[in-house]
Amino acid sequence: MNKILAIIVLSFFLITPSQADESVEIYLLNQLDDPRGFCIDIKGHKLKAQINKGLQAHTCYSYQGKISPDQGFNSRKLTKNQFILTSFNICMEASSLTPSANLRLRKCDRNKLQNFEWSNENKIYLIGNRKLCLTVDQGQSKKGGGGSPVHLMRNLSLELCTESLNPYQTWSVRK
């Protein structure tokens, strides 16, 4: 018993915090009108992001060499259906279980509006209503306030998962 306990304790020291809770960005597979791609992003700027304003699709910051705090999700928690923005310790949450629901940020409490899962087709759907997928707005991108070229933004919502929306509903992660 003591050997097992010693192995468990030792394993905690061998796993660094960065390995246990590594940040990844979640990006749309289709780059749409920005070659840098679109990532799930907190509205606002990096560490000054305004969590009360919710989520959007925004130019991925990884082209700058690292994942931005307002786009960094806890990779370990993603495997447990929790979409936690590591730097803010806050969860992605749907505003409702109905089509066109917005994405907001709330304290993580594992309620049904916070449980999302990846499908085999690279779609992110709400477990409480598996017909709804995380979707980037099909309209024209809006210009942001920074970047060169200027960063682009689009709205995010939950829409019916359909093949015709694949370019706006298929996602992946990267370090």
Q: Which ranges hold each PLM region?
A:
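Sec-dependent N-terminal signal peptides
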Residues: 4-14
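Generic detector of N-terminal low-structure segments
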Residues: 14-15, 75
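Lectin-like carbohydrate-binding module/patch detector with strong preference for beta-trefoil
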Residues: 20-175
